[in-house]
Amino acid sequence: HRELILPQLSGPGVAAHLVKKLSGFKVTYGPIRARDLLVFLDTGLKATPEMRFKTFTTWERTELIPMELVGALKPGILVIAVFFLVAFLGRSEEGWTNALSHGLFSALAMLTAILVGAVLAPLLLPWLPGRAFSVKGFSVGVLFAAILAACYWYGWITSADGLEILAWLLLVPAVSAYLGMNFTGASTYTSLSGVKKEMRWALPLEIAGGIIG
């Protein structure tokens, strides 16, 4: 045979006419999902509308979360270690218990920012405001930053001062916005040009929020 069956979603990265010219193989785009391939072959390479339609359900997004979470936790652990070091260096004169308390608070706040951006943003994706994924991540980050501020306001957080809370009001949305934007690579309906356009304005704001915080 001189026919090459490729997944439908490989289309944007394949120049079918060049494949034919250079190898002699005709490119046929098969179904989106591998599980439909046998039926596609049995029906004479005819795809049903269902084979051409890609869903992005809550469960399908949930399956992608472990990959996103592991990628976010690797640098996150290093940042948490730095926060502990800064807490011990800056608060050691106030006692090791106080230094440990500040370090733990910073670690929990950073983990919250990561979980918000890498877990909640993908799960709540269709219901979060905005079209840009960074805006979606930012919105859920702002919500949790507001909860953090409320906990401090009502005296439920005693291991951080007002300046630290202010810093986290900037850091949590910045981190969650970045991780939300990062999820565009796993989505089914974002375009390369759209992602590049979003990154041009979102990334500087996320970096600024992280640095100021």
What is the role of each PLM region?
Residues 1-32:
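Soluble N-terminal domains of membrane-associated systems
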Residues 9, 27, 110-114, 165, ...:
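Hydrophobic alpha-helical scaffolding
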Residues 14, 32-35, 115, 119, ...:
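Conserved active-site and cofactor/substrate-binding residues in soluble primary-metabolism enzymes
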Residues 14, 22-27, 51-53, 87, ...:
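Hydrophobic alpha-helical transmembrane segments
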Residues 24, 42-46, 50, 129, ...:
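Generic secondary-structure signature for well-ordered alpha-helical cores
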Residues 32-74:
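Cytosolic juxtamembrane regions of integral membrane proteins
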Residues 65-151:
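Core alpha-helical transmembrane segments of integral membrane proteins
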Residues 122, 126, 134-213:
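Generic detector of multi-pass transmembrane helix bundles and their immediately adjacent loops
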